[in-house]
Amino acid sequence: MDQTEQQNLNPIEIADGIYWLGYSYGSSSLHCNPYLIVEGDEAVLIDGGSRDDFSYVMLKILRTGLKPAQIKRLIYHHYDPDLCGNLLQMEAMINTPELHIISHAENNVFIHYYSRKTPKIDYRSINNEFVFESGRRLAFYGTPFCHAPGSFVTYDTKTKTLFSSDLFGSYDTEWALFTDLNPACEICYANQICPVTGKACPLYPIGQFHQHIMTSNAALIHALDVMEALDIERIAPQHGSILSGKQQVQLALHYLRRLGDVGIDYLASEKML
């Protein structure tokens, strides 16, 4: 069994109590990354996945040794089906009145159409945070229009892990769980093939994704301002590869800040409006 097969079958602990529950789709250019945070007898599931992903995600949850009823919160960073599509199945397996959904009011309007059962909380109404019984804290920060009006990110203060939703996501046919950016990336404008390694550039598909998915330069720059104020050790995006280590994080932040032509600004620059 190769490494990819191992990753597809088992939860991968990427930081203390944080498990990647995703699945590699082979040649697909869009990989989805649900995450589970386990703290004591409680757990939080982040961006739980699509309907078709449910069996893989739940198998990995069970293989952590967790009982589904220990999941107390479902965090959805926006309302797309690749995040929320398996909500009905999750509710059936978790099956506890203690379960609540945390998102933004703008998102909850649409999440309601997946299921009306579970109470939905606007993260702003709980002081922008969720605190486990142990004291471990998840902090929420708004990143509006990256890409939905109610988009936000989640920061685990214990491990300094940022769950960035679509930010730092990627269209990537040569996917790996962790990306590996070269220090030379700091001065590179991201070609499809890296001039240093001769391999596919890991930044190029990140740039393509942001130019197509985010709404505007202004929205992306605001989100970067929010994130650069945090002490981040790793970034766990909802698509693409995980960035681990401060150098990797800073290289990616630096690249996105000088990207340009994002969303509506791309169409304007190409005179396509």
Residue ranges of each PLM-predicted region?
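Conserved beta-strand hairpin/beta-sheet module of binuclear metal-dependent hydrolase folds
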Residues: 4-64, 153-156, 160-164
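Metallo-beta-lactamase
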Residues: 13, 96-237, 241-246
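Short, flexible loop segments at the rims of nucleotide/cofactor-binding pockets, characterized by
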Residues: 20-26, 77-79, 138-144, 211-215
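Short catalytic-loop micro-motif centered on adjacent basic/acidic residues
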Residues: 44-47, 73-76, 139-140
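Short, glycine/acidic-enriched loop or turn micro-motifs at the edges of active sites
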Residues: 50-51, 81, 169, 242
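Active-site metal-binding motif and surrounding structural segment of the metallo-beta-lactamase
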Residues: 53-101
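Binuclear metal-ion centers of metallo-dependent hydrolases, dominated by the metallo-beta-lactamase
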Residues: 231-273
